[in-house]
Amino acid sequence: MTLHSLASMTLVTLLALAPAAAHAAHLKEQPRRHRVVYHLSEAGVDKARFVLGNIHNTISGVGGAGNVEAIELVVHGPALKTFVTAGMDPQLKALLTEVQGQGVVFGACGNTMKGFSLTLDQLPPGAHPLPQGGVVRIMELVEQGYVYLRP
């Protein structure tokens, strides 16, 4: 093999690898931004605290809210009564306020609200009613590529 052919092969190899190297460098520069939907339907303060703790840990685990595109907590069924502000557990309220401050959306099932005769003003500030229902909202988010978690 001549020096000229060796140099030509080296050049061809480098040109072939350049796009892969550029793609790998781009991935390092652009951290993945996560989209997650959390599903809560079980009643009880302990369960709600556990789920909000999971949300907090998710945000911390990916390096902070800057690496999260969206997290939505969809609450329906008996779990929604846990979030009625009159008599709401203070620690639960503080946890919810903390994760909402990091961009977490609190979605309240419209069917559950109707079934339990709840109004939006009875729920924590920032709660979003889901008129189509909590399960339908979860389905829509999963279809949009959200990771589904039900701790």
What do the predicted segments below correspond to?
Residues I71-H76, G107-G110:
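Short internal beta-strands
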Residues A20-A24:
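Sec/Tat signal peptide C-region and signal peptidase I cleavage site
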Residues A25-E72, K81-T82:
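N-terminal secretory signal peptides
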Residues M9-A18:
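Bacterial N-terminal signal peptides
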Residues A18, A65-N67, Q100, L123:
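Short, structurally constrained coil/turn elements
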Residues V84-P151:
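A cross-taxonomic marker for long C-terminal extensions/tails that follow the last structured domain
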